[in-house]
Amino acid sequence: MAQVPAGKNRSGQLSKQTGDAWENQARRWLEGQGLRFIAANARERGGEIDLIMRDGTVTVFIEVRYRRSARYGDAAASVTPQKQQRLLKAARLWLCRQNGSFETVDCRFDVVAFTGNDIQWLKNAFGE
């Protein structure tokens, strides 16, 4: 694991590194399922989309979640309605920058959840 410079937010840095590692694992796993990578960590006003991929002709916005155990609920349960709204807003803005919209682009919202060693792929987990 990379060294975190002194004086930096060590907890935040480690969380970012952990998140990046799980997002990379999700990307590789989804590519193995036939999806094609478009973008990672797409930041838009009000939110960030972990992965954007294509499944055939469908643009897929993917939220990646990890929990060490299901003690407080599995990873998928951590995608709250508020988080869903932020993702919808970010996706709408991202599509707009690509000259698209929910009306013109076939898209869906998936969640890839890692709980311990288990992976769960929730296709069409939520929508607008």
Swiss-Prot record:
Task: List the cysteine pairs that form cystine.
Answer: none
Query: What top-level branch of life does the organism fall under?
Result: Bacteria
The ranges of region (Disordered) come to: 1-20
Pfam families recorded: UPF0102 (PF02021)
UniProt name for this protein:
UPF0102 protein KPN78578_35270
Report the CDD domains cross-referenced here. Answer: PoNe_Nuclease
Renumbered to this chain, the signal peptide range is none
Recorded hits in SUPFAM superfamilies, A to Z, give: Restriction endonuclease-like
Can you tell me which family this protein belongs to?
Belongs to the UPF0102 family.
Q: Which Gene3D superfamilies match?
A: 3.40.1350.10
Q: Name one GO molecular function term.
A: nucleic acid binding
